[in-house]
Amino acid sequence: MELRVIERTDTELRIEVAGEDHTFMNVIKGALLQTDGVAAATYDVNPEQSGGQTEPVLSIQTEPDADVDPLDALGDASRQVQTTVDDFTSAFTAAV
């Protein structure tokens, strides 16, 4: 996985997530939408309408009054995904 910031402002972030597909992008988007201060989170695998699939571009918009940096929100969402995976691993191990 390689990340490349395309655009960043106080309330918006667009970042390319090279090497990932819909599976991962849906998980991180879902975690972002549950993160405090995030107004919107989307991704596109064909942002330039090039006629073919490109690397996914994740777009995050935070609420202007929330004082949340979109990059910090992405970090929070990533940690939440890790916590969920750890919880699942523990539950799975206990079940088998």
Swiss-Prot record:
* Protein location: Cytoplasm
Q: Which reaction does it catalyse?
A: RNA(n) + a ribonucleoside 5'-triphosphate = RNA(n+1) + diphosphate
Membrane-crossing residues?
A: none
* Catalytic activity, EC: 2.7.7.6
Looking up InterPro entries in the UniProt record yields: RBP11-like, RBP11-like_dimer, RNA_pol_Rpb11_13-16kDa_CS, Rpo11-like
Top-tier EC class: transferase
Q: GO MF annotations for this entry?
A: DNA binding; DNA-directed RNA polymerase activity; protein dimerization activity
| Keywords associated with the record | Cytoplasm, DNA-directed RNA polymerase, Nucleotidyltransferase, Transcription, Transferase
Q: Which residues form a coiled coil?
A: none
Q: Does the keyword Transferase apply?
A: yes
Q: Which domain of life is it from?
A: Archaea
State the GO CC annotations.
cytoplasm; DNA-directed RNA polymerase complex
- One GO BP annotation of this record: DNA-templated transcription
PROSITE patterns from the entry? RNA_POL_L_13KD (PS01154)
Database matches in HAMAP family: RNApol_arch_Rpo11
Assembly and partners are described as: Part of the RNA polymerase complex.
Role summary? DNA-dependent RNA polymerase (RNAP) catalyzes the transcription of DNA into RNA using the four ribonucleoside triphosphates as substrates.
User: Member of which family?
Assistant: Belongs to the archaeal Rpo11/eukaryotic RPB11/RPC19 RNA polymerase subunit family.
Q: What is this protein called?
A: DNA-directed RNA polymerase subunit Rpo11
Taxonomic source organism: Haloquadratum walsbyi (strain DSM 16790 / HBSQ001)
The coding gene here is rpo11
